[in-house]
């Protein structure tokens, strides 16, 4: 026997001898959370004690249409159907989710109980109760997650909707930052506020601006933690970059202040590291900005009569975009459809009506000159209005007011967002497109990929969700967040999505036509494939992403993921805070009840 083989055989002997002992050694059972009816589930007395600790705010949670299951003709069922198109009504229900599910992904399922938290003490009591009793914990403010992250069956829900107070500051200094961080105008808000609450207080009433989301009923806390882009992000950056301070409750049940001077790692993770993963946010303070005199818009829709004409249209548009729109003034989107349709739905900041019109006139003139190639279905135009009235319901033709008795007078949603309310998703995907694709030599690759993809499914290019072209300060601030740095190099976020109207459990509607729904889901994948061909390692926006993305860590956070994981392990080593494809979720079963690693 060769010496090497002899040594290998000798080295193996102790292992062989130990094998029976190792095989017989008992393995620790994986950590499992408890469900109702299982040993360890809290007794009625324990739930009553929790209710007392949180001031009587503990609720049993019902699904949105539970009243219809017990009494299809009753007032509760009629009320649910009458209001299901109202995003504020949905958000006001503890069991409500802004989308009604996702094909083969998730279905809304109510928590067992919810704490309608009034303050951080209520939240801390709920967090400690869940930790000590091995309960699945869910957190909901706005409930807007496409991924269903605020919906978890058999869980205890921390519901922050009632924590919606808004306070303005002329010169805010984060706690412990005196002499280190200069005072700044800011707004503080409870975690349950929606962006319309801040826009009303900051812009309509006070004449300043806060960077938030485009959809008015999105929760403030969730958007900031996801990174957060709004219509005017090309000018002001991400919502996360505007976070000055957060009050949170950690997995240990402690109330902490996170800012640049106190808990700086946690503060950084909260800026785009994903909601529901690091702590329960109870209050946020965001920077406010000088309000431009004008906000504006550009619009129009046309259809090319041939693929050749459509290619010429896209070629001309991207030439025009690169030269005239790739700057802090212009955001929102254009949509490229499978039937050679091209729709403009863009917004501007800092340009008066004359300036906005002059920017677009060369492109509109080109369309007019090539009218034999196109059918115009919505006449193109551009304009602007005083920015202070952008979110003011009075005189608005685009905002739908919440007409329920007792609803805040400023609550309204954009009519263009109506189809998202209660949507049941068949498929969804997004990817950031780097600004290098706008260079003259690269544009043909971009155009061919868009042509190929749009044959399968409509593609929206959301220019405000890519920060390339934004002011340098906005990009620098975004790079100091946990958001994938690819966002700062992208001129747009491409979004492909399909779905149908509400399919909440208990509605009594026929289930989705599975053949059609699966075909739609495949079309989304087929539409994104050509774009991934030119951006093979593309990043994706965590809030608007593919539920089934296998490389989610890299796609959502890029090079920031290892740091986020280390912060997660430090502040929540036992994985109390858990959401689908959230930091650390790879250690858990899909339902969040069994620890795998």
Language-model region placement:
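Soluble FAD-dependent oxygen oxidases
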Residues: 2-18, 22-597
């Amino acid at each position: 026997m060769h010496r090497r083989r002899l040594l290998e055989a000798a080295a193996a002997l102790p292992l062989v001898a130990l094998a029976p002992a190792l095989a017989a050694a008992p393995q620790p059972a994986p950590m499992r959370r408890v469900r109702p009816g299982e040993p360890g589930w809290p007794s009625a007395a324990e739930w009553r004690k929790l209710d007392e600790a949180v001031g009587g705010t503990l609720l049993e949670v019902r699904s949105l249409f539970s009243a219809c299951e017990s009494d299809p003709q009753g007032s509760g069922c009629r009320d649910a159907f009458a209001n299901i198109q109202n995003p504020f009504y949905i958000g006001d229900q503890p069991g409500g989710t802004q989308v009604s599910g996702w094909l083969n992904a998730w279905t809304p399922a109510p928590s067992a109980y919810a704490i309608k938290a009034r303050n951080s003490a209520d939240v801390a009591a709920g967090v400690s109760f869940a930790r000590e009793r091995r309960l699945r914990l869910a957190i909901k403010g706005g409930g807007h997650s496409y991924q269903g992250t605020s919906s978890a069956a058999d869980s205890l829900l921390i519901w922050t909707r009632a924590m919606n107070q808004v306070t303005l500051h002329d010169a805010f200094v984060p706690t412990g930052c005196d002499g280190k961080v200069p005072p700044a105008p800011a707004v503080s808000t409870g975690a349950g506020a929606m962006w319309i609450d801040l826009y009303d207080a900051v812009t309509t009433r006070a004449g300043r601006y806060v960077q938030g989301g485009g959809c008015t009923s999105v929760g403030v806390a969730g958007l900031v933690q996801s990174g957060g882009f709004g219509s005017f992000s090309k000018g002001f950056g991400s919502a996360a970059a505007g976070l000055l301070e957060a009050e949170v409750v950690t997995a240990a049940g402690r109330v902490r202040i996170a800012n640049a001077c106190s808990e700086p790692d946690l503060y950084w993770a909260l800026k785009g590291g994903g909601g529901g993963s690091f702590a329960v946010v109870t209050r946020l303070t965001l920077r406010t900005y000088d309000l431009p005199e004008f906000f504006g818009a550009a619009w129009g829709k046309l259809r090319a009569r041939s693929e050749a004409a459509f290619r010429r249209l896209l070629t001309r548009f991207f030439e025009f975009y690169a030269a005239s729109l790739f700057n802090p003034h212009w955001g929102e989107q254009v949509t490229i459809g499978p039937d050679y349709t091209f729709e403009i739905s863009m917004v501007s900041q800092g340009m008066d009506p004359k300036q906005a019109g002059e920017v677009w006139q060369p492109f509109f003139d080109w369309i007019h000159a090539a009218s034999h190639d196109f059918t115009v279905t919505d006449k193109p135009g551009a304009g602007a209005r005083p920015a202070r009235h952008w979110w003011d319901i009075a005189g608005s033709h685009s905002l739908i007011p919440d007409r329920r008795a007792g609803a805040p007078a400023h609550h309204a949603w954009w009519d263009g967002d109506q189809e998202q309310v209660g949507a049941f998703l068949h498929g969804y995907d997004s990817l950031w497109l780097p600004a290098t694709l706008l260079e003259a030599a690269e544009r043909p690759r971009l155009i061919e990929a868009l042509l190929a993809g749009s044959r399968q499914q409509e593609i929206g290019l959301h220019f405000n969700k890519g920060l390339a072209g934004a002011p340098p300060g906005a990009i620098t601030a975004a790079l100091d967040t946990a958001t994938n740095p690819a966002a700062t190099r992208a001129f747009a976020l491409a979004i492909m999505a399909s779905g149908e109207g509400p399919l909440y459990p208990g509605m009594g509607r026929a289930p989705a036509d599975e053949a059609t729904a699966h075909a739609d889901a495949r079309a989304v994948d087929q539409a994104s494939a050509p774009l991934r061909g030119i951006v093979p390692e593309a990043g994706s926006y965590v809030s608007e992403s593919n539920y089934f993305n296998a490389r989610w860590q890299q796609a959502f956070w890029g090079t920031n993921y290892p740091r986020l994981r280390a912060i997660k392990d430090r502040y929540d080593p036992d994985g109390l805070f858990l959401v689908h494809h959230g930091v650390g979720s790879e250690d858990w079963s899909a339902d969040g009840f069994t620890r795998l690693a």
